[in-house]
């Protein structure tokens, strides 16, 4: 990519952070509404959980097949077009009269909301090398805040006008954001000479040849699976006795997650200073311990909030560290690196949603916590038994 004469100003960083959060939020508005949507369409818990899975599978497909286009086409035009198409997907969801139609709209929204993952490497490219980790951390905080605050906003809007109102409003906001991005982003022309099949092939080539990318992608996959296991079934827990919370109250729990996400921002700075292996080890240990507090959440709201704070802090911290590390590998191929890493990341999220819904249906909250703790332990063992030693040496 040709780097333009365009400063990465604080205002532009804020715009890109908001755009990233708004785009990815479109995949998560449904989570606190699952109980309501399930009753609307007469669905079981596991069937309702597939709505979230469809969004994440659509997102994973977009990561693999659309994000590499950021290394091929002019980025501003690509970003604005995908933002408008994501808005169109939410219009389908808002007007759906069947589960099949809702899944179609959700999948299309997920497919094009990967625009968030074109904005992240764009910010990394515009940032100076000594501030790259910090900038990526800020943009990624916007992304995770979007995921978490989506639940709060969705719950409040659903209380005011029903669950469909959430998607009507979100669609309008995405259209307005497309206009703001058109006005605010610099133009960046591609310098790659690869065609589309070669771009996709290079993603797989990087996976085959680069141990660090494979390691970080696996860590991201397992970490985000943990995140999805918690948030997919939490609406069912909080809507049932002894809590019996409304959609609006359930959505407010996203604020606890948002606080945890903000607390992880320094992880990018630590990675800039060469301490990525320390933040990864510490984060994965805390991730495992967070499930103890989450388990007590079936009777204690305070324990659940503490668990949410710790889990979201560690998920975001490890994620920021992962991206800061992989962006050092091939500076001219950051969109393709993002495609490979984030495809693994959201495949983990989709798998976590399915595991969570099934665990809830068959084992209740104890089953959900057991599934989450098991995957957290596997993640820690994968890192501890060799990966972190090689990366620290590198």
Swiss-Prot record:
Q: Which GO terms describe its cellular component?
A: plasma membrane
Cell location: Cell inner membrane
Q: Which GO molecular function annotation, any one, does this entry have?
A: transmembrane transporter activity
What are the entry keywords?
A: Cell inner membrane, Cell membrane, Membrane, Transmembrane, Transmembrane helix, Transport
The record lists the membrane-crossing segments as 10-30, 50-70, 79-99, 100-120, 138-158, 166-186, 218-238, 243-263, 291-311, 337-357, 364-384
Under the heading CDD domains, the entry gives: MFS_NepI_like
Q: What is its main location?
A: membrane
Gene3D superfamilies, per database record: MFS general substrate transporter like domains
> What membrane topology is annotated for this entry?
Multi-pass membrane protein
Q: Which family does it belong to?
A: Belongs to the major facilitator superfamily.
* Protein name per Swiss-Prot or TrEMBL: Putative uncharacterized transporter YgaY
- Record the organism: Escherichia coli (strain K12)
Tell me the gene name: ygaY
């Amino acid at each position: 990519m040709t780097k333009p004469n365009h400063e990465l100003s604080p205002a532009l960083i804020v715009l890109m952070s908001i755009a990233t959060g708004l785009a990815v939020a479109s995949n998560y508005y449904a989570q606190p509404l699952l109980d309501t949507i399930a009753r609307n369409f007469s669905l079981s818990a596991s069937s309702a959980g597939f709505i979230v899975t469809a969004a994440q599978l659509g997102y994973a497909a977009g990561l693999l097949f659309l994000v590499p286009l950021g290394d091929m086409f002019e980025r501003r035009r690509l970003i604005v077009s995908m933002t408008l198409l994501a808005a169109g997907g939410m219009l389908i969801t808002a007007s759906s009269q069947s589960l099949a139609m809702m899944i179609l709209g959700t999948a299309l929204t997920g497919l094009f909301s990967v625009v968030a993952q074109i904005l992240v490497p764009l910010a990394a490219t515009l940032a100076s090398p000594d501030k790259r980790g910090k900038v990526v951390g800020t943009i990624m905080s916007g992304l995770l805040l979007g995921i978490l605050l989506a639940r709060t906003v969705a719950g409040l809007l659903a209380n005011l006008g029903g669950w469909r109102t959430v998607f009507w409003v979100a669609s309008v906001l995405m259209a307005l954001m497309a206009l703001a991005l058109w006005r605010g982003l610099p133009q960046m022309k591609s310098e790659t000479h690869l065609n589309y099949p070669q771009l996709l092939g290079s993603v797989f080539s990087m996976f085959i040849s680069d141990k660090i990318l494979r390691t970080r992608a696996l860590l991201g996959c397992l970490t985000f699976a943990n995140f999805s296991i918690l948030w997919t079934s939490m609406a069912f827990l909080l809507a049932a006795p002894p809590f019996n919370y409304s959609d609006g109250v359930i959505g407010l729990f996203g604020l606890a997650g948002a606080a945890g996400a903000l607390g992880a921002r320094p992880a990018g700075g630590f990675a800039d200073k060469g301490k990525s292996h320390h933040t990864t080890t510490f984060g994965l240990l805390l991730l495992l311990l967070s499930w103890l507090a989450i388990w007590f959440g079936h009777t204690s709201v305070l324990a659940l909030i503490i668990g949410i704070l710790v889990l979201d802090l560690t998920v975001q911290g490890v994620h920021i560290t992962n991206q800061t590390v992989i962006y050092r590998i091939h500076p001219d191929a950051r969109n393709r690196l993002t495609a490979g890493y984030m495809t693994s990341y959201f495949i983990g999220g989709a798998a976590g949603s399915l595991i969570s819904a099934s665990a809830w249906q068959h084992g209740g909250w104890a089953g959900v916590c057991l599934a989450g703790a098991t995957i957290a332990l596997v993640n820690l063992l994968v890192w501890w038994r060799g990966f972190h030693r090689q990366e620290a040496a590198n």
